């Protein structure tokens, strides 16, 4: 169970699954939509999601080749908890940042002594 939680709790997995929730995307479309992800990390994330059954990869016989990524039924089931996590993060970002600032200030104060 921990390996599955590790996969679905990964930052990039959450972002990729969220973007694919709007429909199939090509690699570069997905990379642009996610933002801040390297080509290598996106490749690794997509391969892991495909291996675990969350994403399908479809290669179209065109020139140049076209590859689409799409959520499977299992991936679509993951959308609801991913969306809830994203909503929670948006709602609580200020509170988390305030807690971090208080903690950092307390640590800085004790290290000065």
Task: Give residue spans per PLM region.
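N-terminal helix-turn-helix DNA-binding core of bacterial DNA-binding proteins
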Residues: 1-41, 47, 68, 76
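Generic structural "secondary-structure junction" signal
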Residues: 7, 62-65, 105
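Hydrophobic residues in alpha-helical membrane-spanning segments
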Residues: 25, 62-66, 82
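Short, flexible helix/strand-to-coil boundary loops that buttress conserved ligand/catalytic motifs
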Residues: 31, 59, 82
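Beta-hairpin "wing" of winged helix-turn-helix
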Residues: 50-70
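C-terminal regulatory/oligomerization modules of transcriptional regulators
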Residues: 51, 56, 73-113
